[in-house]
C-alpha cells in the first residue's frame, strides 16, 4: 500500500479573466450548471458551514465540471467550506499521472493524489473479457472512504449527474426488480461518511458542452480495457431515444424521483397496508377510482398520440 503524501496546497491562481473570452451562450450554460449545483446543495443540505468537501476527480468531464462548479459557488456561498480535490491513480496502463497534479496546481486548489494498484487485483480476479467495473468500484470505494477519514473530510463529493441517476433507476427496474435509483445524498453503511452528488440536477449533455469549452485535460475512462455494461448501454440508448422523440419525458421522470407516493405503490415496508382500515386517513387522499391528472401533451408528442388513438379505434 503506497503511503499518502501530504495534501498539496498550491499558490492560489489569480482570478481568471477567461469568462470575457467566452460567448454569452457559454456563460448562460455555466450559470445554469452552477445554479443546478447550488439548488441540489440547498435542497438536500449537502454542504454546511465548516465542512471539508473531498471532491473525487477521475479526469473525466463530470468530475472536472463538479470541481469547477463547487469552486465557483464557494466564492459566493453564505457558508464557509474547504475543498480538497482527490484523485486515485489505480495504476491502469497508460494512465497519465502528471495530468491531474498539473491541472490542480494551475487552478490553485488543494489536492491529494493517492496511488493504489487496484488494476492488478482486478485483472487477477476477473476473467479476461468480463466487465471489471463492479469489483473495481468496490475497491475504489474502500480507498475513498479511507482517504476521507485521513483527511478529516466531512463530505465526499462524486460527479454523478441526472442521467446517471435515471439510468440506475431503469437498470434496477428492468433487471433488478426494484424501484431504486441513485440518491443525491447518502450515508455509508458504517455511518461514518456522507456522500453527496451535487450534479444531481445537471444533464450529461450540458456537462459535455461545458467541458468541451473549458478544454479540461480529459483522461479516457477505458484505460483498463473494460467495456461498458451491456445492460446500462441499452438503458442509455433508450433514454437518449426518448429525449429525442418525446420532449419533456426525461424531465418528467426526473421530477418523479422526488414525488414518490408510497401509499400508491405496493411496498408494505414503506406503507402500512396491513393496518389500513376504514378509519385510516391517507395524506394522498382517496383517489383509488380517479384517473391520474396528467399535463397536456406537447405539440411534438400529439401526432404520435393521435396515431395511437386512431389505431385503437380502428381495431375495435
UniProtKB/Swiss-Prot annotation:
UniProt keyword terms in alphabetical order: 4Fe-4S, ATP-binding, Cytoplasm, Iron, Iron-sulfur, Magnesium, Metal-binding, Nucleotide-binding, RNA-binding, Transferase, tRNA processing, tRNA-binding
Residues given in the record as [4Fe-4S] cluster binding sites: 133, 136, 224
Gene Ontology terms: cellular component: cytoplasm
EC numbers: 2.8.1.-
Signal sequence interval, chain numbering: none
Enzyme class: transferase
Pathway terms, separated by semicolons: tRNA modification
CC cofactor: Mg(2+); [4Fe-4S] cluster
Motif stretch (PP-loop motif): 58-63
InterPro entries on file: Rossmann-like_a/b/a_fold, TilS/TtcA_N, tRNA_Cyd_32_2_STrfase
GO molecular function, one term: tRNA binding
Swiss-Prot/TrEMBL catalytic activity: cytidine(32) in tRNA + S-sulfanyl-L-cysteinyl-[cysteine desulfurase] + AH2 + ATP = 2-thiocytidine(32) in tRNA + L-cysteinyl-[cysteine desulfurase] + A + AMP + diphosphate + H(+)
Main location: cytoplasm
Homology family: Belongs to the TtcA family.
Listed name of the protein: tRNA-cytidine(32) 2-sulfurtransferase
Gene that encodes the chain: ttcA
Amino acid at each position: 500500500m503506497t503511503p499518502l503524501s501530504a495534501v498539496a496546497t498550491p499558490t492560489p491562481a489569480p482570478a481568471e479573466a477567461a469568462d470575457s473570452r467566452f460567448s454569452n451562450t457559454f456563460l448562460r450554460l455555466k450559470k445554469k450548471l452552477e445554479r443546478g449545483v447550488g439548488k441540489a446543495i440547498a435542497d438536500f443540505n449537502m454542504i454546511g458551514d465548516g465542512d471539508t468537501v473531498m471532491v473525487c476527480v477521475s479526469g473525466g468531464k463530470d468530475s472536472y465540471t463538479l470541481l469547477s462548479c463547487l469552486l465557483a459557488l464557494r466564492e459566493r456561498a453564505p457558508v464557509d467550506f474547504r475543498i480538497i480535490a482527490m484523485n486515485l491513480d489505480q495504476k491502469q496502463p497508460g494512465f497519465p499521472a502528471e495530468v491531474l497534479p498539473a491541472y490542480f496546481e494551475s487552478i490553485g486548489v488543494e489536492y491529494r493524489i493517492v496511488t493504489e494498484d487496484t488494476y492488478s487485483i482486478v485483472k487477477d480476479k476477473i476473467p479476461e473479457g468480463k466487465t471489471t467495473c463492479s469489483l473495481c468500484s468496490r475497491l475504489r470505494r474502500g480507498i475513498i472512504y479511507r482517504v476521507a477519514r485521513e483527511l478529516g473530510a466531512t463530505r465526499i463529493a462524486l460527479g454523478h449527474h441526472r442521467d446517471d441517476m435515471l439510468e440506475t433507476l431503469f437498470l434496477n427496474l428492468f433487471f433488478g426488480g426494484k424501484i431504486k435509483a441513485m440518491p443525491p445524498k447518502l450515508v455509508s453503511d458504517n455511518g461514518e461518511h456522507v456522500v453527496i452528488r451535487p450534479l444531481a440536477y445537471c444533464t450529461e449533455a450540458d456537462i459535455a458542452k461545458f467541458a468541451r469549452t473549458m478544454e479540461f485535460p480529459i483522461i479516457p475512462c477505458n484505460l483498463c480495457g473494460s467495456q461498458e455494461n451491456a445492460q446500462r448501454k441499452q438503458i442509455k440508448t433508450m433514454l437518449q431515444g426518448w429525449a429525442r422523440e418525446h420532449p419533456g419525458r426525461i424531465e418528467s421522470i426526473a421530477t418523479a424521483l422526488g414525488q414518490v407516493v408510497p401509499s400508491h405503490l405496493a411496498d408494505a415496508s414503506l406503507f402500512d397496508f396491513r393496518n389500513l382500515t376504514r378509519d385510516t386517513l391517507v395524506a394522498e387522499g382517496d383517489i383509488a377510482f380517479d384517473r391520474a391528472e396528467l399535463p397536456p401533451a406537447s405539440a411534438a408528442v400529439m401526432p404520435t398520440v393521435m396515431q395511437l388513438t386512431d389505431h385503437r379505434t380502428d381495431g375495435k
